[in-house]
Amino acid sequence: MECLRSLPCLLPRAMRLPRRTLCALALDVTSVGPPVAACGRRANLIGRSRAAQLCGPDRLRVAGEVHRFRTSDVSQATLASVAPVFTVTKFDKQGNVTSFERKKTELYQELGLQARDLRFQHVMSITVRNNRIIMRMEYLKAVITPECLLILDYRNLNLEQWLFRELPSQLSGEGQLVTYPLPFEFRAIEALLQYWINTLQGKLSILQPLILETLDALVDPKHSSVDRSKLHILLQNGKSLSELETDIKIFKESILEILDEEELLEELCVSKWSDPQVFEKSSAGIDHAEEMELLLENYYRLADDLSNAARELRVLIDDSQSIIFINLDSHRNVMMRLNLQLTMGTFSLSLFGLMGVAFGMNLESSLEEDHRIFWLITGIMFMGSGLIWRRLLSFLGRQLEAPLPPMMASLPKKTLLADRSMELKNSLRLDGLGSGRSILTNR
């Protein structure tokens, strides 16, 4: 009640104060103020002495800093609670597999990476950060260190089968990898590139028979019409082929980008910069950068072969499309020709049907008394219509015939014989001159 009674006194004084002073007063009253029961006496102090103390810049700065610290602490707590958790599968040099869960913040702090380095990207890429190789292949993300290989968040059944059955043996040296005598990162990179090439090859091997079978059914000359269901299947397979061509192109571009720069090849040899023994071997005779270049060139050629195979399928689809269009045009031409023939027949019948129209006007004539006149007029009508229709069809056939290629004018036999005799005479003269010159030189 005392607070309510003191409001008329406080409001005029509060209206004179600036907005920042009022905010500071509100913060201070809510944080360190006394209970509400003692508001009457405190109200007068707020109007006079407390307002003067709180209006200072130091007091305002302290209140703003406290408010800022509170919001930053809350935001950090919420970010820590919302931080994503990765399911990490670790492979060491001996092929041992361990799985664990780790927060993203903890993981990139342990690996010495930045938060942007562990972002998921659906584009194929190979990058090096802080002596760590980061490989992204759509749903596969891997971090390669000189000691181990980390696979982050695999969510594919086929990938799981490859991870736990084939990859450990390849990393331990029991597989058919060419880079087994080289450091660990070579084996890891080769295993991942080999898996991705096999994946692209599998997609192509699935699409190729489907596309060829559909094209054979569409281009078959036995079928006069085009099956729309086959066209729909071909359209879907064409879209899948376009996606495969894009994946192969991105794979080739990512490898070619590394091959064009020697510094990136040197950075991919991470054991060279962390292990002094490997550095001595690389300095002595084994050039690890050159070995890495040969490895990437090999898989670039494999990707190029896949690209050529996909391009051949695309050319077959385009050629078959042109053949289908030609067949459709031929069927359309047949229908148009039939329409012209029927139109000509209708025209000829209507032309000689005028005779029947003349007799149907109910006019009296002497021809109606003879019973043979009906059959005579009817026969003349049909014969005349048939003759005119035949003439129109022959005219149409002459107009639609393809023009013959121009004939080459043949030379007469006499000129050919004369040319041959002249050639023989010239050859004999040259031989005679040559023999005479040789005799003179011998003498």
From Swiss-Prot:
Segments on the Mitochondrial intermembrane side according to the record's topology features: 360-370
Binding site for Mg(2+) 1: E243, T246, D247, E312
Gene Ontology molecular function: magnesium ion transmembrane transporter activity
Principal location: mitochondrion
Membrane-traversing stretches: 340-359, 371-401
Keyword Transmembrane listed: yes
UniProt-annotated location(s): Mitochondrion inner membrane
GO biological process: lactate metabolic process; mitochondrial magnesium ion transmembrane transport; transmembrane transport
Note: Has the ability to complement a deletion of MRS2 in S.cerevisiae and partly restore mitochondrial magnesium concentrations.
UniProt family annotation: Belongs to the CorA metal ion transporter (MIT) (TC 1.A.35) family.
Domain notes: The GMN motif acts as an ion selectivity filter.
Function in brief: Magnesium transporter that mediates the influx of magnesium into the mitochondrial matrix and regulates magnesium metabolism. Also permeable to calcium, sodium and potassium ions. Required for normal expression of the mitochondrial respiratory complex I subunits. May play a role in maintaining the inner mitochondrial membrane potential.
Protein name: Magnesium transporter MRS2 homolog, mitochondrial
